[in-house]
């Protein structure tokens, strides 16, 4: 089984990183082959909404996403770890997610209507932390995660969301 962990924070060793490291330790202990991505260290342009992927299922932007797409498609389980920045995900992580419109388009082009919403490819999970105690802190992130995993034909099977965590290592 392949497990992919996506570090959404630009702060290495921060609270969301610590959550993801623990999740990956558990996956490795269960025999999974784990790999990770750090979008903030990669060349990932935002989606241009050019519509090319709507016709072909392939994004025409040439950057690090071309190497990321196969990793996303091969993983059985994906963990997305993210801090909350103004009630949302950091921009580098969000750019990666937005660029998965190509994978959603690919699925819609290549699968029959009855197979388009089977979510039979695997499971996705979100690990999120934020400093504020706001009641709606994670609502937007849950929606983004749900539709990110939908684009990958994966079910969104759960989350760990921790608020009132501000300083590095406070979790």
Predicted regions and their residues:
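Cysteine-centered iron-sulfur cluster-binding motifs in ferredoxin-type domains/subunits
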Residues: 10-13, 17, 45-53, 76
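N-terminal beta-loop-helix "entrance" segment that forms/cooperates
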Residues: 39-58, 166-171
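Helix-loop-strand module that forms the ligand-binding subsite of alpha/beta enzymes
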Residues: 60-150
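A structural signal for isolated positions on well-ordered beta-strands in alpha/beta enzyme cores
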Residues: 2-4, 35, 125, 157-158
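N-terminal beta1-alpha1 ligand-phosphate binding loop
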Residues: 1-32
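Residue-level recognition of beta-strand->loop/alpha-helix junctions
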Residues: 7, 38, 160-161
């Amino acid at each position: 089984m392949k497990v992919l962990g996506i570090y959404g924070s630009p702060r290495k060793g921060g609270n969301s990183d610590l959550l993801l490291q623990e999740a990956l330790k558990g996956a490795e202990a269960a025999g999974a082959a784990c790999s990770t991505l750090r979008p903030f260290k990669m060349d990932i342009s935002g989606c241009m909404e050019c519509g090319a992927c709507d016709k072909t299922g392939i994004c025409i932007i040439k950057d690090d996403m071309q190497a990321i797409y196969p990793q996303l498609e091969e993983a059985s389980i994906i963990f997305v770890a993210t801090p909350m920045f103004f009630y949302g995900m950091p921009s580098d992580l969000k750019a990666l997610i937005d660029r998965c419109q190509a994978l959603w388009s690919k699925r819609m082009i290549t699968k029959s209507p009855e197979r388009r919403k089977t979510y039979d490819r695997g499971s996705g999970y979100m690990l999120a932390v934020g400093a504020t105690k706001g009641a709606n802190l994670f609502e937007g992130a849950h929606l983004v995660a749900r539709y990110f995993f939908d684009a990958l034909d994966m079910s969104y099977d759960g989350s760990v969301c921790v608020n009132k965590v501000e300083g590095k290592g406070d979790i």
